[in-house]
Amino acid sequence: MVIKPKIRGFICTNAHPVGCSEHVQEQINYVKQQGALKNAPKNVLVIGASTGYGLASRITAAFGGGAKTLGIFFEKEGTERKTGSAGWYNTAAFQNAADEAGLWSKNINGDAFSNEIKQKAIDTIKADLGKVDLIIYSLASPRRTDPNTGEVFSSTLKPIGNAVTTKNLNTSKREIDEITVEAANQDDIDNTIKVMGGEDWEMWIDALKQADVLADNFKTTAYTYIGKELTWPIYGHATIGKAKEDLDRATAAIKASTSDLNGEAYVSSLNAVVTQASSAIPIMPLYISALFKVMKADGTYEGTIEQIQALFSENLYGDTPRFDEGGHLFQNYKELEDDVQVRIQAIWDKVDTSSIDELTDYVGYHNEFLRLFGFGIQGVDYEQEVDPVQPIANMID
């Protein structure tokens, strides 16, 4: 079939297999150009391995460090009538590239929150890897089923205390308008912590430890975004912020429970980037469009793969890791410089519908959004018929 983007609100409901493959290849090429990682991990488990920062982590570990990688994800396969999800095509492309490069790589498709998928991962590690020395936790999900009680929790994106009315870039209408987000109640906060906090990360590490598949001196990191004043009302001082704070609690718990292995656990603070998750968050499309304008003008903007390659080389495996005042590995320091934030604020205050293209890089934002789904990739002929069915090799049933 000929595949063109179908956009509904802030999501794209289809994906292009060839475009996704090219996008993955671009990231692989970037990592290779940076040279080999020093002190690289050997056996890596990536929980949330198919898109965004998780995919970039898998690519960096494999093609920057020669690591064996086991990827966990929850994606949809294509059929003859309907495309698969971008993450499915990304993983198919990653697996093909890993095979070509002679890199060990296996894949598990299913609910990472479940006990069943944890057990599958453990069985695979025992059979093929022995132990893992890096565990990346990069899940973004709107809901979670508690594996022990069966209760389903849904996350919300709401401020805490008072409702917030703020400027917003309505991406479907291409307009600047105002959005009011109602304040969260305690259930909203608790449920969001359940879905997006550190409990499942902790459960993964506990399960891996009990199964004796964690290497001595292993490292694990979960990813977070910690913005400044502009994004605080919806992101920091909000339900999602409380969930991210719970990652700090989990970090301490993981360090304590794995102290006999000298385990290292970190939360890594990363750039605001265009992902399927961030495009759903009110204010983020406008904030990122302004951020693009400022940081691209300075030549300092880093996308997903640039951030992760630098996180690995400078922080996770670097000689002098950089920490923020909260003790997180601090990779988005360029974004949070006062000068950058002041210029973003100036754009924010001034921009209206008529000046979107002049004052922000919304075009860049929109292009980056399309690229997530394999569209707008240079060198891909979108008039060509393509097969939406793309099998993933080395999938564990």
Curated annotation (Swiss-Prot):
EC annotation from Swiss-Prot or TrEMBL: 1.3.1.9
UniProt binding sites for substrate: Y225
Residues binding NAD(+): 48-53, 74-75, 111-112, 139-140, 244, 273-275
Enzyme class: oxidoreductase
MF terms (GO), sorted A to Z: enoyl-[acyl-carrier-protein] reductase (NADH) activity; NAD binding; trans-2-enoyl-CoA reductase (NADH) activity
Catalytic residues (positions): Y235
Gene Ontology biological-process entries: fatty acid biosynthetic process
Subunit-structure text: Monomer.
Role this protein plays: Involved in the final reduction of the elongation cycle of fatty acid synthesis (FAS II). Catalyzes the reduction of a carbon-carbon double bond in an enoyl moiety that is covalently linked to an acyl carrier protein (ACP).
Name of the molecule in the record: Enoyl-[acyl-carrier-protein] reductase [NADH]
Pathway annotation: Lipid metabolism; fatty acid biosynthesis
Gene it is expressed from: fabV
